[in-house]
């Protein structure tokens, strides 16, 4: 949306590149939006409006029920029926540390998803500017996960094709929603497919795309370097442009229950 807005006001040159990570812009048959209707959306919006936010645990439950066999019933059997402790898994532990979502943001995202508004030029607006994804011409790097249950990779592929970028690089990682991104080099099980988005059908794209072993991170790093403005010295202190740090790390929010 920001890229489309900058293009509409004549400031697209402020973007050297655009990166979309497990991002669904076309909500048709994808994620939560495909599982609810208008009435259910209004109920969800009303519930978050009462408190002023959507609790992070409630949001995590929504995503868990998109994949109930692995993320719900598996733990019911293991923890409750068999009385075992779940095996430690750092990625899922990090995933459980969810955050709250302001009610206004929740309302906007739900309505945008139910109506699939981003696929319609002018379907949503930003700072008074109608959003048209087709006007986004910035070079784009898109990453999706082949086993992603939240952002299905086919939907990510369709979303990339909504943009007007002349140069797009689509990467399909051999992992799910989180592990597709938390994918450091050196994993012998990791692999990815890569190619342009000229092919209309995502499954045909997958069959023809180049396959590589290991992580996609080095590929992304090289792609960014080609479009960047060289390396810059890291700041010696946090903050800047009139914004000072709020408090020392890790902050107070991480201690809230």
Q: What is the predicted role of each segment?
A:
Residues 4-108, 225-257:
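Alpha/beta-hydrolase-fold enzymes
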Residues 152-162, 174:
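Short alpha-helix in the alpha/beta-hydrolase fold that links the catalytic acid
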């Amino acid at each position: 949306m920001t890229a489309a807005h900058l293009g509409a006001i004549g400031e697209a040159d402020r973007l050297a590149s655009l990166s979309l990570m497990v991002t669904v812009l076309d909500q048709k048959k994808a994620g939560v939006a495909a599982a609810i209707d208008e009435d259910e959306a209004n109920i969800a919006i009303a519930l978050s409006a009462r408190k002023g936010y959507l609790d992070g645990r409630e949001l995590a439950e929504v995503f868990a029920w998109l994949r109930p066999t692995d993320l719900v019933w598996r733990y019911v059997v293991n923890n409750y029926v068999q009385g075992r402790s779940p095996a430690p898994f750092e990625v899922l532990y990090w995933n459980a540390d969810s955050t709250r979502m302001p009610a206004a943001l929740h309302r906007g995202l739900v309505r945008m998803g139910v109506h699939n508004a981003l696929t319609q030029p002018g379907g949503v607006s930003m700072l008074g500017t109608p959003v048209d994804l087709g006007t986004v011409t910035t070079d784009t790097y898109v990453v999706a996960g082949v086993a992603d249950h939240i952002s299905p990779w086919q939907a990510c592929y369709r979303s990339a094709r909504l943009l007007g970028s002349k140069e797009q690089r689509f990467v399909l990682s051999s992992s799910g929603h989180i592990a597709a991104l938390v994918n450091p080099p050196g994993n012998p099980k990791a692999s990815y497919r890569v190619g342009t988005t000229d092919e209309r059908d995502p499954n045909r794209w997958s069959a023809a795309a180049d396959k590589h072993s290991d992580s996609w991170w080095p590929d992304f790093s090289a792609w960014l370097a080609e479009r960047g403005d060289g390396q810059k010295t890291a700041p010696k202190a946090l903050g800047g442009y009139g914004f000072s740090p709020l408090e020392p790390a890790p902050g107070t929010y991480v201690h809230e229950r």
